[in-house]
Amino acid sequence: MLDIKFLRANFEEVKEKLQHRGEDLADFECFEELDTKRRELLVQTEELKSKRNEVSQQISMLKREKKDAEALILEMREVGEKIKGLDNELREVEEDLERLMLSIPNIPHESTPVGETEDDNVVVRTWGEVKEFNFEPKPHWDLATDLGIVDFERAGKVTGSRFVFYKGAGARLERALISFMLDLHTEEHGYEEVLPPYMVNRASMTGTGQLPKFEEDAFLIESEDYFLIPTAEVPVTNMHRDEILSAEQLPIRYAAFSSCFRSEAGSAGRDTRGLIRQHQFNKVELVKFVKPEESYEELEKLTNDAERVLQLLELPYRVMSMCTGDLGFTAAKKYDIEVWLPSYDTYREISSCSNFEAFQARRANIRFRREPNAKPEPVHTLNGSGLAIGRTVAAILENYQQEDGTIIIPEVLRPYMGGKTVIK
């Protein structure tokens, strides 16, 4: 959520920056009208309440003097009815303003490239050499199915499309990657491990920005009004909702493994085969709470931490700076890390690393004090995938495949695979 005082003072500047996002600003235009109306109602209400207090004192004085106060009592009742009407009107205006504020996306940082589509994203750096195969590389879903380490067909029978059973070496590879990533981030990168709940309430989904705008993308348990988490970012960020932290506690860095659940509404026809776009998938998420002046330095560190996973796995990748039109609702700046997938003959996203500045912190009321008696101010929050497990499995299968269909296990994973060197 944006700072309403900043928005009020810089309306045209914010409007211009949101236009760079390609946003429909029809609702945004209502802000000034609603904000003005709210402030007018507050003034009117306070004036009437002040008048009511004065009349109440006059009535008390007349009663003490045994004088007739009936006219003033009637006047006070009329004032009370007016206050009641204004309070109801104010409540409606504030609810409309709250809905509007929750629907306005974050302002892009000045370093975010201006553009309309993914074609305008900027390559920041590349790492690793793309392997040249002397045979036609297979897609990961064929490799995994032929090896018997996944079963899409039976998962479809048990649940539906875009689910998978991992089996044997496939299940162990998934588990190995989870352990490897958590060990790396906690032992070398300084994160604290968290195992979060997989269900959250509406306040949590609103705090991180999934609600109200993206409810159709989430799985709702209607009987409880809980949501299955689309990412561990939601429960982990909301761990500190409605809290005031001390400056000494910052930065806070969490690494959380979880399953993630997404309806992928509107993605029919895209990545319908394989592990790239599943309704349920595993991910290690990195979440940070930092001082505002440190957040962009922490974004670079966060991105480097996610990159380190791919470097140790020796998987070629590139880092993209996302343009304003491809930034996402909550981010002020975002990097996508894209891993090379031979069967696609291109790079595909495996991690997004974002700085939300104070956007989520305002929604979730997460603040800190610089000094013990200082006024609380919003923290800056960041998060990134470190990494998406299924997509990492896909990248390993495709980049480490041999002509006979076997898979060389990356050296760094072999201790987690019981010393095995090949999946066959």
UniProtKB/Swiss-Prot annotation:
Q: What is any one of the record's Gene Ontology cellular component terms?
A: cytoplasm
Q: Which UniProt keywords apply?
A: Aminoacyl-tRNA synthetase, ATP-binding, Cytoplasm, Ligase, Nucleotide-binding, Protein biosynthesis
Keyword Nucleotide-binding in annotation:
yes
Residues binding ATP? 262-264, 349-352
Q: Magnesium: is it a keyword of this entry?
A: no
Q: Which InterPro entries match?
A: aa-tRNA-synt_IIb, aa-tRNA-synth_II, aa-tRNA-synth_II/BPL/LPL, Ser-tRNA-ligase_type_1, Ser-tRNA-synth_1_N, SerRS_1_N_sf, SerRS_core, tRNA-bd_arm
Q: What is its EC number?
A: 6.1.1.11
Family according to the record: Belongs to the class-II aminoacyl-tRNA synthetase family. Type-1 seryl-tRNA synthetase subfamily.
Subunit structure as annotated in this protein's UniProt entry: Homodimer. The tRNA molecule binds across the dimer.
| UniProt cross-references to HAMAP family, sorted A to Z | Ser_tRNA_synth_type1
Say what the protein does: Catalyzes the attachment of serine to tRNA(Ser). Is also able to aminoacylate tRNA(Sec) with serine, to form the misacylated tRNA L-seryl-tRNA(Sec), which will be further converted into selenocysteinyl-tRNA(Sec).
Q: What is this protein called?
A: Serine--tRNA ligase
* Species, as recorded: Bacillus cytotoxicus (strain DSM 22905 / CIP 110041 / 391-98 / NVH 391-98)
The gene name on file is serS
